[in-house]
């Protein structure tokens, strides 16, 4: 066989192999799309996915996925006349909201060198919202939809990059602007191991109304003598709040638990260069009320065959109100959460979404929540869960802390719950701890930060009152307090006291 013939045969084999690899890659991507669409239908309901089409080609394909939902209608207040509820005329005039659609178009290149990369396929997805009104379009006129790029490797792993371009939002005096955000994720070939990182240099929101829900006190409030209370004092008109977060970033790695979406053992680290909250009166200068810097945090999840435990740590420095802290710390531990109970909780949320949209998913009906608690509560307690939280700070050269925790030591039986109720049996079989240690020198500035001026004599009187009543102890330059509730008894600073009426019975 001549050299030319050998070269031709080799070239033909390469072309055949590449063509076969391209066809196989296309088949695998098509199969993955069908599986993802089926999982999505299962999660959000058959009616929510109105289209999932796939046009397959040899070197490239196109996929189209469309989700549809109808936004929740605004709540119309019900008027009362002489104690009878009357539906206002405006309720009948409420226009039914039109369905909205989220459209995802994906261009897919497949083959051993898809997209000039050694990969089985490269998927570029673009998103669009349909059905939004003109007001919403105008509010997001300077914003772009995110993009998603997925690289599927030959051995089954994949790289995901979610990118949100820089943009702006403005509506009814509230405005926001943000820098480019990027989220990079690597999913292992087992579809369980996930690693990733994200970067978001800046997010600023301005014009938020401050305390709008508390502008008016209850006008029907009566004083202790049964007389109508004085006219309520309205909060400052035009007071607004702004939030600015800069230098956000982080990374994570986890191994997903079967049947538990987005949760599994692993670690996450995050950082924020600066977080600032500013308030401003209508005609006054802005006032910085929170200014925290060098914020770092980490989360660790651990799991065994039946339970999941979570620990969080956050640290930073900066100012809250007039108090300039040398350091601030937050620690949290949630231990022994039953995995089956978490699965059932996620299932309840999904069922709520299918039945009534996002609002019902986030706030399930009272009877639905009660049924879930009755079914899952005993199993949750059998794992003996616990929760602990600690706040610590350094201020003016001194350290102080606040902490509390709760843990189940003995799971109650169904008979005990039926006889005495949840609260008494929980108190009998659980332990509650709380403690505080604060420098006395902090009290003046803490009171000032809350709008009260305390002189030395007033401070001494306040400390003496707290000490003589048994609620606090004086330990040199510190005020301390310790509380423990266990076996149906309350121990406050070493003194056993009866539980509040009704809790222990």
Spans of features found by a protein language model:
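Positively charged n-region of N-terminal signal peptides that target proteins for export
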Residues: 1-6
